[in-house]
Regions:
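Peripheral terminal appendages
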Residues: 17, 34, 428-435
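Short histidine/acidic/glycine/proline-rich micro-motifs that form metal-
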Residues: 213-215, 311-315, 387-388
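Short, electropositive alpha-helical surface patch
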Residues: 222, 256-270, 317-334, 395-399
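Short, hinge-like loop/turn segments at secondary-structure boundaries
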Residues: 258-260, 284-285, 324-326, 353-357
Length: 435
């Protein structure tokens, strides 16, 4: 009998999984005195929304304490924790079974030890051929109606990414699978042209990369994002881009052309100025210094650029708000927005695992503040508050951000894009030219 690698261990017996209990709170835990902020570049920061400091909300209870201890027990279990050598250069520290899978996988020691170390997990690119490429959005707190995701998953490996749970739709984990199994859509530009030619199509700003970073490392090879921009430029179609990659500067030639026609704006996500923290949170994204340099290059090229301080993680990077905004303003950013940490579905457990690995002494404090801002829960998906939270801590974060943004002139919200220039792409006839 030949020895099997540890990453190919047999499955244990199926373990039944309970259905998800994530439901929106019908009351929303909203007070008219609490601030509401949006990370969107189109949403104004309303000074009048800041009222008196809200009363203290729910505190860190017994359920939360048990969740913290459960995370510690999980990370002490070698059948759950992925070995450090295997996840070198990755953000997630675990790879739990997808929430829609009927059975839960658990590793076990079969006695076939191997002496050599297993190599780090490679990135696998899976080609996907979707039938459509524009996704419609009807969430009232998201100020774009359409989006395009050139990829599924993201190699940047940001530990906090709210899009991680979407990998469950592919039967995969929101942990390491999300950053090692990337789905690429090479026919995206072709589909986009077809959809823009539809007789009933109405142009509105398309968000490029709502659930993935359009300039993640695999874009260097596949160039799907650039092909999409080429179509949008020819059609004079407005687009908004969110990225934390310096690769966006590769397309300055296209973006400059679109900026001249008021068709593009770019938001650079900057979560910290500390390179050590960045390596832990977002190991394959550009360094903070590189992102600030990207802001400078885009601004000097005449491309409207804003900065997103997103997410703000209690007790981890919340002390950097003012410093990030100041550095961004000096680099040439024109606007700024923020989002409080969001932990939908199994992301809450992934975040606890990450904290146990990197900041075990802060685990309880992080979730104490987060639950205070989420009505006593790890996450509240209520549309009116999911971006900014509620309660005293959320109020304080909003007030600090607004004050700094106003002082630095980053609260103008003046990057409106044109849609009146749109012209549908010409339909190819399939006939050869005579000349």
């Amino acid at each position: 009998m030949s020895a099997r690698p540890k990453d190919q261990q047999a499955l244990s017996r199926p373990v039944k999984r309970s259905p998800s209990a994530h439901r929106a709170d019908p009351k929303g835990h909203v007070s008219e005195k609490w601030p509401r902020f949006s990370a969107s570049n189109d949403a104004p920061l309303k000074k009048e929304s800041i009222g008196s400091i809200p009363k203290v909300g729910p505190t860190f209870g017994s359920d939360a304490l048990e969740a913290a201890e459960a995370a510690r027990r999980r990370m002490d279990d070698p059948a759950y924790r992925v070995e450090r050598d295997r996840r070198r250069g990755r953000g997630a520290v675990s790879n739990p079974t997808g929430r829609y899978e009927p059975a839960q996988r658990e590793g076990f020691d079969d006695g076939w030890d191997i002496e050599e170390e297993l190599p780090p997990l490679p990135t696998e690119v899976i080609i996907e051929k979707p039938r459509t490429i524009i996704t419609k959005n009807d969430s009232p707190d998201i100020l774009f109606e359409k989006s395009i995701n050139p990829y599924r998953g993201c190699e940047h490996g940001c530990s906090y990414c709210f899009a991680r749970p979407t990998h469950a739709y592919q039967g995969l984990s929101s942990g390491l699978d999300f950053e090692t199994k990337i789905f690429a859509k090479p026919n995206a530009a072709e589909l986009l042209e077809k959809e823009l030619r539809a007789s009933n199509y109405q142009p509105t700003t398309i968000a490029l990369g709502a659930n993935t970073d359009p300039y993640q490392p695999v874009e260097r090879k596949f160039r799907i994002t650039r092909s999409i921009l080429e179509v949008l430029n020819r059609a004079n179609h407005p687009v908004g881009i969110v990225t934390k990659s310096a690769l966006v500067t590769r397309d300055i030639d296209l973006l400059s052309q679109m900026a001249d026609k008021h068709l593009v704006k770019v938001a650079i996500s900057i979560t910290t100025l500390d390179p050590k923290l960045a390596r832990k949170m977002e190991p394959r994204a550009a360094t903070p210094a590189k992102r600030l340099e990207t802001v400078r290059k885009l601004s000097e090229a005449g491309i409207p650029v804003s900065v997103l301080v997103a997410p703000i993680i209690p007790a981890i990077n919340d002390h950097e708000i003012e410093a990030i905004l100041k550095a961004s303003q000096l680099a040439g950013a024109q606007e700024a927005g923020y989002v409080l940490l969001r932990l939908p579905h199994d992301l809450k457990d992934l975040m606890r695992d990450w904290l146990v690995e990197h900041y075990p002494d802060k685990l309880k404090h992080v979730f104490s503040l987060l639950q205070e801002a989420r009505g006593g829960k790890d996450y509240d998906p209520a549309w009116s508050t999911r971006q900014s939270g509620v309660g005293p801590y959320a109020w304080m974060i909003g007030r600090r951000f607004e004050t700094a943004a106003e002082r630095l002139g980053l609260n103008k919200r003046n990057l409106s894009l044109r849609k009146d220039l749109f012209k549908a792409p010409a339909k190819e006839t399939g006939q050869l030219s005579l000349f």
